[in-house]
Amino acid sequence: MFFVLESNSNNVLFRIQRIYIKDISFEAPNTPGVFQINWNPKIKVDLNSDAKNIHIDMYEVVLCVTVTAKIEDDTAFLCQVKQAGIFNVSGLNKTQMIRCLKVHCPTILFPYASECVSNQVSRGTFPQLNLDPINFDILFIQSLQKKYNDTLKI
């Protein structure tokens, strides 16, 4: 699959080589008791991503999605999915490459991770859970702002 990324160069390449689950975990520590409680959980979603160069112009990007559902102080379930992809990327300057690996690649991986979370929650016999779409562009900008603010505190 090819994508066109914003660049002044005609030599930009972006290809998805593979998308796969790197790690998956589902825990429901308070079953079966949690099934007897009125289902009105507090859902917390944590996201992070990491990218590493694995070969010339080839990167592995791993998106980690952790979902915790709590009813009062009891954990109903905890689901963690590490959705990974191998991307062939070239022709970008350093700034464009960072944005590609921190925004574009996680955006591609998120629907796969979300579906995996939903499947695991359903297999745990909990009500359907559909994660809201994530704007990785905003998360990236916020992380840059935080790094900038942290450097000002020194």
UniProtKB/Swiss-Prot annotation:
Source species, domain of life: Bacteria
Keyword flag Protein transport: yes
Entry's Gene Ontology cellular component terms: cytoplasm
Protein localization: Cytoplasm
Major localization listed first in the record, in broad terms: cytoplasm
InterPro entries hit by this protein: SecB, SecB-like_sf
Family designation: Belongs to the SecB family.
Subunit structure comment from the entry: Homotetramer, a dimer of dimers. One homotetramer interacts with 1 SecA dimer.
Function summary: One of the proteins required for the normal export of preproteins out of the cell cytoplasm. It is a molecular chaperone that binds to a subset of precursor proteins, maintaining them in a translocation-competent state. It also specifically binds to its receptor SecA.
Record-linked NCBIfam families: PRK05751.1-4 (NF004393), secB (TIGR00809)
Protein's name according to its UniProt entry: Protein-export protein SecB
Originating species: Blochmanniella pennsylvanica (strain BPEN)
Phylogenetic classification of the source organism: Bacteria, Pseudomonadati, Pseudomonadota, Gammaproteobacteria, Enterobacterales
